[in-house]
Amino acid sequence: MANIKSQIKRNKQNEKRHERNKAVKTGLKTAVRKFREAAEAGDKDTAVALGQDAARKLDKAASKGVIHKNQAANRKSAIAKKAASL
């Protein structure tokens, strides 16, 4: 455990950020999974709506710095490609 005040504060901040980032990533995984399930079931209307929701969450996560912007772009591209093939 750190003895320096600034490092103690940093540890607290890092723990808070870790929890927040984990929550955002969990929400992302859920959104993408729901889209994939709808796409595999062949439900085009639902899949398109869920794809838009997943893309929105990916953009938000990238803007918050939870994931890299290129990773968000790659995932959005894959979602759009899968939605277009339905």
UniProtKB/Swiss-Prot annotation:
Listed Basic and acidic residues bias regions: 12-22
Gene Ontology terms: cellular component: cytosol; small ribosomal subunit
An annotated Gene Ontology molecular function: structural constituent of ribosome
SUPFAM superfamilies: Ribosomal protein S20
Keyword Iron-sulfur: no
InterPro entries, per the entry: Ribosomal_bS20 (IPR002583), Ribosomal_bS20_sf (IPR036510)
Superkingdom of this protein's organism: Bacteria
GO biological process: translation
Record keyword RNA-binding present: yes
Pfam families referenced in this protein's UniProt entry, alphabetically: Ribosomal_S20p
UniProt keywords, alphabetically: Ribonucleoprotein, Ribosomal protein, RNA-binding, rRNA-binding
Region (Disordered) residue spans: 1-25
Function text: Binds directly to 16S ribosomal RNA.
Family statement: Belongs to the bacterial ribosomal protein bS20 family.
Name by which UniProt lists this protein: Small ribosomal subunit protein bS20
UniProt organism field: Nocardioides sp. (strain ATCC BAA-499 / JS614)
Upper classification of the organism: Bacteria, Bacillati, Actinomycetota, Actinomycetes, Propionibacteriales
